[in-house]
Amino acid sequence: MEHFDVAIIGLGPAGSALARKLAGKMQVIALDKKHQHGTEGFSKPCGGLLAPDAQRSFIRDGLTLPVDVIANPQIFSVKTVDVAASLTRNYQRSYININRHAFDLWMKSLIPASVEVYHDSLCRKIWREDDKWHVIFRADGWEQHITARYLVGADGANSMVRRHLYPDHQIRKYVAIQQWFAEKHPVPFYSCIFDNAITDCYSWSISKDGYFIFGGAYPMKDGQTRFTTLKEKMSAFQFQFGKAVKSEKCTVLFPSRWQDFVCGKDNAFLIGEAAGFISASSLEGISYALDSADILRSVLLKQPEKLNTAYWRATRKLRLKLFGKIVKSRCLTAPALRKWIMRSGVAHIPQLKD
């Protein structure tokens, strides 16, 4: 049975960043359910916008995005729609439009060969015994059993590691549903849509590489019905759909209290969305995935006396920032306050008409 310093479950942005930064300094194994190349297998349903905080992480790491990761077009504003109030406003935003699956594969490709990576793999079981973490996973057609001193859950909203560590922990969840359509709009755009009759979260649209992506986060019970109802409503705001080319869905976490942020215990750690590190106001998680990976890298390499306590303390600033997003979300999803903000015209950039 092979033993490692660190076992990382999941190679989204958080897991890939951590594996890259620990390479050559610790003996690392990393498991991921995505394939190494191509579009076969699992791909993360995601709008694919890189926020300024995520961009800053790449600046710190000296990384530049390859052209095949960047999508077309690049848009500098978000059309914000309040359906009930029939209000539309344009707010400046500095997102980079990316192909999310290509981005994830590129992040994995940066992991040095010294890290033992298993693509298209499935983690079957984890447990702690004799001060070690045991991991059973399936890859290359057969089951393998390894041990590790440290276990890292970078496995997203449905984190197996989080469920093992905190079996009674409950966090609010939504089903994120997206459909892709051939682009019909004469001028591509991003949008953020609020309709409290549909969801107490929000919906979105993105123009990307000749497609129009429409999606949102909805209650788990009847999300598909609510999604369809909202699509019908959006014709009043000049949204054009046609026949769906592709439909996709996944679970998304929605932190709503301080206790929703969980960092791990017993030499197991959670990073990215697995820890609840996702913005409640925008559902953006890449920047917090990268930041939490960098924080954990620092803790693991410094080897303080109590690693879990050190990681909890080191993420305090990040958790406070995310708690601020919870407060912001409550403001944005409060109909009266949102209507007042949008009607005030603050930060709105009117579009010139011919």
From Swiss-Prot:
Q: Name one GO molecular function term.
A: FAD binding
Q: Which InterPro entries match?
A: FAD-bd, FAD/NAD-bd_sf, Geranylgeranyl_reductase
Q: Which domain of life does this protein belong to?
A: Bacteria
Q: Which family does it belong to?
A: Belongs to the CbrA family.
Protein name (record): Protein CbrA
Q: Which species is listed as the source?
A: Shigella sonnei (strain Ss046)
Show the taxonomic lineage.
Answer: Bacteria, Pseudomonadati, Pseudomonadota, Gammaproteobacteria, Enterobacterales
Gene symbol of the encoding locus: cbrA
